[in-house]
Amino acid sequence: MQLYLAAEAAETPDVDPRLRLVCVDYRFDRSFPQGLPQAPEGVMLLGGDLSARRVGEIGEECARRGLRAVLAGFGHSPALETARFCDGLLRRGLRPILTENAWQAGCGAEMMISSALSGGDLRTRLEEALGRCDGLCLDLERLRRSFPLPCPDGEGEALSARALADLLHRGAKPSFSEELMCKAFTAEIKGETRFVLFDDRETLRRKLRLAASLGVRRGFLLYPEWSAEDAAAAADA
């Protein structure tokens, strides 16, 4: 499985040669960034509302930089526009990758889904997704959330890295969830008992091993949510 580290051009870190860098500065509603280096076999990540009108320009930029795939679907993605977008990329020899919300059957795109779950079973989720799409990619979103008990909606609240570190320093005893493939513990937060889920390098490696065993093709990590050192450690999985 190929790993990608997505970062802004202005803060691009030095990375392990086994990883490929992805620039997050491309957007459908803006001029494309200038002067970015060659990225053979790389991926263009496009933010904003999906539009098929820029497929020609996308093809030219991908040819210039050696990119082979385009990841999109982070904003509004109408079904007809998405189908035209994917068709335009495929006709230019580019592989479309769409987020789960934008993906549709028959579009010829790989689907990207998040590895961060607060319920269910990650293996089952990956297996079901693989049965629906033309190829699966994993958004290795770093899970770091706390949940009230009970929590019917499963949403919870985001925890900062510092807040999580403080909870662990206070003596929390995390356990590993085989279903969610993350670590978990209960803690008192502002006088309330809450359930905490989080990822670290160990859970990242476990998720990658599971995904690779099922045939997932690509995994994307966001910098600085994951450091270059985290990404290098993940490449050892």
Where are these regions (language model features)?
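Chitinase-like catalytic core of GlcNAc-active glycosidases
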Residues: 1-121
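A structural motif corresponding to the C-terminal end of an alpha-helix
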Residues: 62-65, 89-96, 128-135, 206-217
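Flexible, active-site-proximal loop/turn residues at the rims of small-molecule/cofactor binding pockets
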Residues: 75-77, 142, 225-226
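Short acidic, glycine/proline-enriched helix-loop-strand junctions
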Residues: 79-96, 175-185, 228-237
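Active-site region of glycoside hydrolase catalytic domains
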Residues: 94-96, 105, 124-149
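Active-site proximal loops enriched in glycine and acidic residues that flank catalytic Cys/His/Asp
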Residues: 100, 140, 223
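Glycan-binding loop/region signatures in secreted carbohydrate-active enzymes
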Residues: 135-206
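Acidic/aromatic/glycine-rich contiguous surface patches that form carbohydrate-binding/processing clefts
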Residues: 212-237
